[in-house]
Regions:
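Extracytoplasmic gate region of multi-pass secondary transporters
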Residues: 33, 210-262
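Helix-breaking motifs and short loop linkers at transmembrane-helix boundaries and internal kinks
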Residues: 44, 76, 97-102, 273, ...
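Conserved MFS/SLC helix-loop-helix module at the cytosolic interface between two early adjacent transmembrane helices
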Residues: 63-101
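Helix-to-loop junctions at the C-terminal end of transmembrane segments
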Residues: 64-76, 261-274
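Helix-loop-helix hairpin linking two adjacent transmembrane segments in secondary transporters
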Residues: 103, 132-133, 140-186
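Cytoplasmic helix-loop-helix junction between adjacent transmembrane helices
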Residues: 107-144
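C-terminal transmembrane helical hairpin of 12-TM major facilitator-type secondary transporters
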Residues: 273-318
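A late C-terminal transmembrane helix in Major Facilitator Superfamily
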Residues: 326-365, 371
Length: 397
């Protein structure tokens, strides 16, 4: 990404920025699912159009993910992340109060565009400004706060009286995030990511790395599970006889397990050479969770959510691998810019397909069987993605 321009930031400031940014990476999306039916009634939209709302995050993440690295090359990591935060604040602040569905979609795009830039660039920003134990601690903070965001997002539907309030409330932490970036910008300077891979290795496309390709599909399949859960799980449970509040709590339970995964996974990766059992256990838990919803959703909805939550630890695992399997901020940014957009294309298409299949079949059977199959596919690619190799070395070979 060009020549490095790097300034040292105070550790406290690093942690504050990472905490606030990660806190806003899921709440603006996860808060939609519990009130999706109310939004559908308010705008008078079809199930297919509602499915579009659940697909937007993945598709926009893919598009903005492709733009994130070139944009950061031009203006720097911190400036790009600050600009994305501004878009997030505008979208979250205005989205609940519009009367046009088209405008609602446009403002949702602002929300997910801001989140998308942070999804791709925050790991590279952490790699750029952190080192040693601080780097591991920052990645732990990042993945943990992602779980907090996922857990808290659905609960706004329980605490707020209207769907508008449930969505708008998340503008407040986004404003705090914007203030933090305003403080960081003068100190960070034009922090273009630096790298260590030279020559052909620096120019070779990421798809020439088998591990990077496996990470793309692993990330994509786990993101698929996450966005189907955030977009459709509460509705699945409600239509199978579970109360609305319980359905919202079930989604929050998944987020609680993501918090645990955020704490555990960076630590686990930094200490274990062999991670093979991890994707096996997590993928099988995901499969079992979907199976429980299929055969007995109302019998133990929180148990099925807990299994999905354990399986959801694949997400912090995939994120932690971005820095653990690269040697430089440059390669981290390139890997993140390859893995996340490609993964989010898959994660965007599947939730959209869920709405279409549900509308065509009239129930959730085909959808849930398909999700169980995808869980097993995640197991297969996860075995390759967790191999202990460095992407830099594969590119230079």
């Amino acid at each position: 990404m060009g020549s490095a321009f790097r300034r040292s930031l105070a550790p406290v400031l690093l942690f504050v920025v990472v905490c606030l940014t990660a806190l806003n990476l899921r709440s603006g999306i996860a808060s939609v699912a519990p009130v999706l039916g109310q939004i559908q009634d308010f705008f008078g939209i079809s199930s297919g159009q509602a499915g579009l709302l659940t697909a937007l995050p993945g598709l926009c993440f893919a598009a903005m993910g492709l733009a994130a690295v070139p944009l950061a090359r031009r203006v720097g990591l911190s400036r790009t992340l600050a600009g994305g935060t501004l878009a997030l604040v505008v979208g979250l602040g205005l989205r609940p109060w519009v009367s046009s569905f088209s405008l609602f979609v446009a403002l949702t795009l602002c929300v997910v565009a801001g989140i998308a830039l942070a999804n791709v660039l925050l790991p590279a920003w952490i790699k750029q400004h952190g080192s040693g134990r601080t780097l591991v601690a920052l990645m732990t903070t990042y993945t943990t706060m992602l779980g907090v965001s996922s857990a808290l997002g659905p609960l706004s539907a329980v605490t707020q009286k209207s769907w508008q309030g449930a969505l708008w409330i998340w503008c407040l932490p986004a404003i705090a995030q914007l203030v933090a970036w305003i403080v960081v910008l003068p100190q960070a300077g034009r922090d273009v990511a630096h790298g260590t891979v030279d020559g052909a290795g620096a120019q070779r496309p990421m798809f020439t790395s088998p591990t990077a390709v496996a990470m793309l599909f692993f990330f994509g399949l786990q993101s698929t599970m996450a966005y189907v859960q955030m977009g459709w799980l509460p509705r699945m449970l409600v239509e199978k006889g579970v109360g609305e509040n319980t359905a919202s709590v079930a989604l929050a339970v998944i987020g609680v397990f993501n918090i645990a995964g955020g704490v555990v996974m960076p630590w686990l990766i930094s200490r274990l050479d062999r991670l093979t059992p991890v994707p096996i256990v997590l993928a099988l838990c995901t499969c079992a969770g979907w199976g429980g919803v299929l055969v007995a959703a109302d019998a133990a909805p929180l148990a099925w959510a807990s299994l999905m939550g354990i399986g959801g630890m694949c997400f912090p695992l995939a994120l932690a691998l971005l820095t653990a399997r690269t040697r430089s901020a440059l390669t981290t940014a390139r890997l993140s810019g390859f893995v996340q957009p490609g993964g989010y294309i898959l994660a965007g298409l599947v939730p959209l397909s869920v709405g279409v299949v549900r509308g065509a079949t009239g129930d959730w059977t085909a959808v849930l069987i398909g999700l169980m199959v995808l869980s097993l596919c995640m197991l297969v690619v996860g075995l390759r993605a967790t191999t202990h190799v460095y992407i830099d070395d594969e590119l230079a070979a």
